[in-house]
Amino acid sequence: MIFVIHAMDKKDAINTRAKHYKAHRQHLDDSEKYGVGVITAGPFVADDNETPIGSLFIIEAKDRAAVKAFVESDPYHTNGVWEAGGVEIHAYHKKRG
């Protein structure tokens, strides 16, 4: 199954995000440990086209439980970059592209 993860940063998270960026990238590289494959991932940015304000992932996984475990172990989640309760996980049906 394909899932989309939508996670918005806390308003004051820019420094925390930067501090945990390398660990977050390593987590993405290690996604197979959680039974998920990252199709694409990247930050949402502010209108200045530079300042990160959240994260978007499109991943493949056998089920929502694997996705949830992957998200909850992400350094951005464990270190409070993302808004509490602000992470959404949705199943996705690819129709084009």
Region spans (language model):
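Conserved, structured core segments of small domains
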Residues: M1-G97
